[in-house]
Amino acid sequence: MYDVHVIFNTLPGELARFGQLLGRNGVGLEGGGVFGVEAHFLVEEGEKARRVLLDGGFNVQAVRKPLIRKLKQERPGELGEIAAALAAQGVSILTQYSDHANHLILLTDNDKLAAEITGPWVANAKDQFTS
């Protein structure tokens, strides 16, 4: 899975154009969101998404592998716990969202260290997306 970071133009319909363009080209969105003009979406085929979006005139900032984790969701405060564990080791979360399977998607300023720190949250979900 890949996070695609795009800066939208401040025009009505940019999200529609984005979603329709990817859909016409067989790229599905597995999660994500838009924050002002900054969009982050999870896709299976990162390079294909980049190519389609660039050819369609979108401002693609980055395509990268995010950390994919799973919170047990048994009690309030679990997101705060994983965020605190990262912060305690000097890792900043740059982007956080969920996918359609309720995985926690994280982009950090140090993904290698973040992967080590968040190891306990991988054990919460053993599937093809968590590693």
Residue ranges, per PLM feature:
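A conserved regulatory-domain signal marking ACT and ACT-like small-molecule sensing domains
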Residues: M1-S131
